[in-house]
């Protein structure tokens, strides 16, 4: 009895006992919300590499940031009053008296300003190169992120340059258009926020906000279409406008994801402070930018597939790509027991089983 119990206890270490087998898991939707997180987790290294491409490829923007931050400018003081020179002369000639002090206190007030230097204009010139690099980077990264969303094998370096070489003309042209449109919208918003207030200004502000959001959503689809179809830029823009309105549900979810990333960045900088400022600087350089881009591509591609690709293949089934693995020989089955697997392994290696020895 004791031997039997001992044998039963040690049975848990017996590799020949039948295994639990594979459980039946419900299949995930190819374009579903849950699959986004699975795909993101499985490809986080590649998405990080895409972020590096975005940062290094758009290097001219760092020169513009340096200019806007004032690092290339010199300090100066500008008087508020046109009578500053007269008051200043009286102050110098008459000396310090109650009258000159009163006059200088009224007309001698100055404000601190930053004035451009030669280095500022050099940085402006270097920063303007963004109009040439922006389209290339967006095309290359859109191709990589689209393939990740589709579940295809991705080779980040070669895929990036393949997409750039294949679409460089459209990427260059639309990259310039993209920078100009984005710059105009940002400039209008800045002036409307910090300019004079009024009913007309308020209406113009909200109209600009709506246009900016609409164009931001259109950009989900522009570069994905560029690397997927052979279409003219005008047709790509037209289709993107249609997709921005038709695919509202997916577009809004992606927009909320982008806003969540920006909100976290805001918290790290202004709410938490301290060591979290380091995270606020590091995250956009490592993962945040490509994460937001992947959200947009994931939302866009499957809507494009639903409304353009699948209907086309239904009308032209002979052009549908054939699955190259469909007719491959089965290498492993899951309908056999662990004991049968072990017997097969022993047979292949010329090892006799206990039954054969008997």
Predicted regions and their residues:
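Helix-coil boundary and N-terminal low-complexity module in membrane systems
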Residues: 1-190, 201, 220, 225-239, ...
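Hydrophobic alpha-helical transmembrane segments of polytopic membrane proteins
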Residues: 211-222
């Amino acid at each position: 009895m004791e031997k039997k119990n001992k044998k039963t206890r040690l049975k848990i270490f017996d590799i020949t006992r039948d295994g639990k087998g594979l459980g039946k898991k419900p299949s995930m939707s190819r374009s579903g919300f849950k699959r986004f997180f699975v795909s993101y987790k499985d490809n986080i290294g590649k998405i990080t590499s895409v972020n590096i491409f975005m940062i290094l490829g758009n290097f001219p923007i760092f020169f513009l940031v340096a200019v806007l931050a004032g690092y290339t400018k010199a300090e100066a003081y500008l008087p508020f009053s046109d009578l500053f020179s007269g008051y200043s002369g009286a102050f110098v000639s008459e000396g310090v008296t109650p009258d000159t002090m009163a006059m200088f206190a009224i007309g001698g007030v100055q404000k601190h300003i930053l004035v451009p230097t030669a280095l500022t204009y050099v940085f402006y010139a270097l920063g303007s190169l963004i109009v040439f690099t922006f389209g290339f980077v967006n095309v290359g990264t859109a191709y990589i992120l689209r393939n990740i969303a589709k579940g295809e094998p991705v080779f980040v370096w070669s895929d990036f340059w393949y997409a750039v070489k294949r679409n460089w003309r459209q990427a260059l042209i639309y990259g310039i258009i993209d920078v100009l449109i984005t710059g105009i919208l940002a400039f209008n918003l800045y002036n409307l926020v910090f300019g004079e207030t009024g009913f007309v200004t308020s209406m113009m502000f909200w109209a600009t906000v709506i246009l900016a959001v609409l164009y931001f959503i259109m950009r989900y689809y522009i570069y994905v279409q560029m690397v997927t179809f052979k279409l003219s830029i005008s047709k790509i823009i037209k289709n993107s406008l249609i997709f921005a309105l038709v695919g509202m549900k997916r577009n809004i979810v992606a927009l909320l994801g982008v806003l969540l990333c920006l909100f976290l960045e805001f918290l790290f900088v202004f709410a938490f402070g301290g060591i979290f400022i380091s995270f606020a600087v590091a995250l956009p350089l490592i993962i945040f930018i490509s994460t937001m881009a992947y959200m947009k591509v994931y939302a866009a591609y499957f809507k494009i597939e639903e409304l353009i690709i699948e209907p086309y293949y239904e009308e032209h089934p002979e052009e549908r790509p054939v699955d190259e693995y469909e007719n491959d020989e089965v290498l492993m089955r899951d309908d056999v027991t662990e004991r049968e697997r072990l017997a097969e392994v022993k047979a292949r290696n010329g090892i006799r089983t206990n039954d054969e020895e008997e």
